[in-house]
Swiss-Prot record:
Family from the record: Belongs to the RbfA family.
GO biological process: maturation of SSU-rRNA
Record PANTHER family: RIBOSOME-BINDING FACTOR A, CHLOROPLASTIC-RELATED
Protein name: Ribosome-binding factor A
Keyword Cell membrane carried by entry: no
Record's keyword terms, sorted: Cytoplasm, Ribosome biogenesis
Native organism: Shewanella amazonensis (strain ATCC BAA-1098 / SB2B)
GO molecular function, one term: ribosomal small subunit binding
Amino acid sequence: MAREFSRTRRIGQQLQQELAFVLQRDMKDPRIGMVTVNDVDVSRDLSHAKVYVTFFEEDPQVIEAKLAALNTAAPYARTLVAGRMKLRVMPELRFIYDASLVEGMRMSNLVSKVIRDDEAKKGHIGDEPQEGQREED
């Protein structure tokens, strides 16, 4: 019977927490700035980990530069996290930009805009006199 949470998933969750802490407190690279660790996907043999991150930037060039800086600093981040976690093998980190949060916010804004437009149209249509009604001056 399979466990509800596999070992790789538990390690991924702990790695996510430790990376978030290390990136906020210990990494002093100004090129990285504010970064959010959304998820960590660890391979079954614990040799590699994909770290999904987002930034508070929307410019694709800035995002690419920050992602490149993170991937350059990945060995240092790996060393810092290895000191905080008790693992025999520390996965090699690979940072990947996660656009799902930004895309979700964009979709939410679109839905809100459509709802506002519909309500405005209903209000505008309701203001017009219908057949059989007269406007009073």
